[in-house]
From Swiss-Prot:
Residues 1-22 are annotated as: Disordered. Pfam families: Tom6 (PF17112). Residues 1-15 have a biased composition (Low complexity). Forms part of the TOM (translocase of outer membrane) complex that consists of at least 7 different proteins (TOM5, TOM6, TOM7, TOM20, TOM22, TOM40 and TOM70). Belongs to the Tom6 family. It is found in: Mitochondrion outer membrane. It comes from Saccharomyces cerevisiae (strain ATCC 204508 / S288c). Coiled coil: none annotated. Residues 53-61 are mitochondrial intermembrane. This is Mitochondrial import receptor subunit TOM6. Keywords: Acetylation, Membrane, Mitochondrion, Mitochondrion outer membrane, Protein transport, Transmembrane, Transmembrane helix, Transport. It is a single-pass membrane protein. Component of the TOM (translocase of outer membrane) receptor complex responsible for the recognition and translocation of cytosolically synthesized mitochondrial preproteins. TOM6 is involved in assembly and stability of the TOM complex.
Length: 61
């Protein structure tokens, strides 16, 4: 029962010390990363919709 329901890496984590997280890894795990990523996607989408490229892709009805 021990191997089937154990968390992956639980046994190995106790024996070996954890490496300190880099600044980027700590930022990537923070909620600010999700907010910044979604904000960047939103800005890119608005810029694409407002661009002349969108006018060229849309059919002229």
């Amino acid at each position: 029962m021990d191997g089937m329901f154990a968390m992956p890496g639980a046994a190995a984590g106790a024996a070996s010390p954890q490496q300190p997280k880099s600044r980027f890894q700590a930022f990537k795990e923070s909620p600010l990363y999700t907010i910044a990523l979604n904000g960047a996607f939103f800005v890119a989408g608005v810029a694409f919709i407002q661009s002349p490229l969108m006018d060229m892709l849309a059919p002229q009805l």
